[in-house]
């Protein structure tokens, strides 16, 4: 009776470890995508206050009023 219980416990531990590893890699991929969406202008000029309309902002965006649309 001890052998099947030990085998099942080890199999369950291995399965849970693989699920946890896969889950953390999915979370890190989702986080990198989300960070890119939340901060698309990181390191670039994104403030349009005082600039003329259609000025370039966020590398590929355009200023309209005080807002950068990209």
Swiss-Prot record:
Q: Give UniProt keywords alphabetically.
A: Disulfide bond, Knottin, Neurotoxin, Secreted, Signal, Toxin
Its primary localisation, in coarse terms, equals secreted
Give the range the annotation lists for the signal sequence.
1-21
Q: Which cysteines are joined by disulfide bonds?
A: 41-58, 48-63, 57-68
Looking at the UniProt record for this protein, which Gene Ontology cellular component terms does it annotate, in alphabetical order?
extracellular region
Report, as the record phrases it, the tissue specificity of this protein. Expressed by the venom duct.
Q: According to its UniProt record, where is this protein located?
A: Secreted
Q: So which domain of life are we looking at?
A: Eukaryota
Tell me if Disulfide bond is a UniProt keyword of this record: yes
One Gene Ontology MF term: toxin activity
Q: Which residues form the propeptide?
A: 22-33
Domain-level remarks: The presence of a 'disulfide through disulfide knot' structurally defines this protein as a knottin.
What is the recorded name of this protein?
A: Conotoxin Cl6.13
The species is: Californiconus californicus
């Amino acid at each position: 009776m001890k052998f099947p219980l030990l085998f099942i416990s080890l199999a369950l531990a291995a399965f849970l470890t693989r699920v946890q590893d896969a889950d953390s890699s999915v979370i890190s991929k989702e986080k990198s995508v989300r960070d890119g969406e939340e901060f698309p202008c990181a390191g670039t000029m994104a403030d349009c206050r005082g600039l003329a309309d259609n000025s370039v902002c966020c590398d590929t965006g355009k200023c309209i009023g005080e807002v950068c649309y990209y």
